[in-house]
């Protein structure tokens, strides 16, 4: 398996769990997925689509990641924990993009034309985020874990939620910015609401006993 220096460098820069380049080349699943995509993409561009799709199938079978060989991906592409990553045929991804596990860059149309997202440079897409349709995500954008993005996002924005909404743009908070490890959790929010209701009921019962 061949590894591009820029993709390997991205692993070393972005994944603190990797202690050496040798370790990354042997065991880093995301790097392996990117390498297999690069090989398949070259074959796809050369018109050897059957060979490209075979590599894609092998990659999906081994890793759980499905990056169509027709997708266009720039340099220094980093996938952390590749399982569940899906990138469609007409997706375009810029340079220095970070994708976490379970991310989907999908289509919402059955047409043969451009139907998947275009992602700019220096973008971070959090765990389980879904970006759908022929939309454009600008440069320097952060998409929070679990977000569902269905519309264009301008440069220098932070997006969270379902549907995805901009909470920060060009350094100005529109809502409270949330980090990758501090994003909305609907289940946890419901639990906290129930706890508050229980506490209130306890207070009412205590007052009745007096």
Task: Write out the residue ranges for each language-model feature.
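Terminal amphipathic alpha-helical/low-complexity segments used for targeting or macromolecular assembly
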Residues: 1-63, 174-210
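Structural signal for interior beta-strand "rungs" in well-ordered beta-sheet cores
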Residues: 60-167
């Amino acid at each position: 398996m061949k590894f591009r220096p820029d993709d390997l460098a991205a692993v070393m820069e972005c994944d603190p769990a990797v202690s050496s380049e040798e370790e990354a080349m042997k065991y880093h699943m995301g790097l392996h997925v990117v390498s297999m995509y690069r090989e398949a993409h070259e074959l796809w561009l050369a018109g050897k689509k059957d060979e490209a799709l075979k590599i894609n199938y092998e990659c999906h079978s081994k890793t759980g990641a499905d990056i169509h060989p027709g997708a266009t991906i720039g340099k220094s592409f980093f996938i952390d924990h590749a399982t569940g990553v899906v990138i469609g045929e007409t997706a375009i991804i810029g340079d220095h993009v970070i994708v976490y596990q379970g991310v989907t860059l999908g289509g919402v149309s059955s047409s043969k034309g451009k139907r998947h997202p275009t992602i700019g440079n220096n973008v971070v897409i959090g765990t389980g985020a879904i970006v759908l349709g022929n939309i454009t995500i600008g440069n320097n954008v952060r998409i929070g874990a679990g977000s569902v993005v269905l519309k264009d996002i301008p440069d220098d924005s932070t997006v969270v939620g379902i549907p995805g909404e901009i909470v920060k743009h060009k350094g100005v908070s529109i809502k409270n910015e949330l980090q990758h490890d501090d994003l909305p959790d609907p289940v946890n929010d419901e639990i906290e609401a129930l706890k508050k209701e229980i506490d209130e009921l306890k207070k009412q019962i205590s007052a009745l006993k007096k």
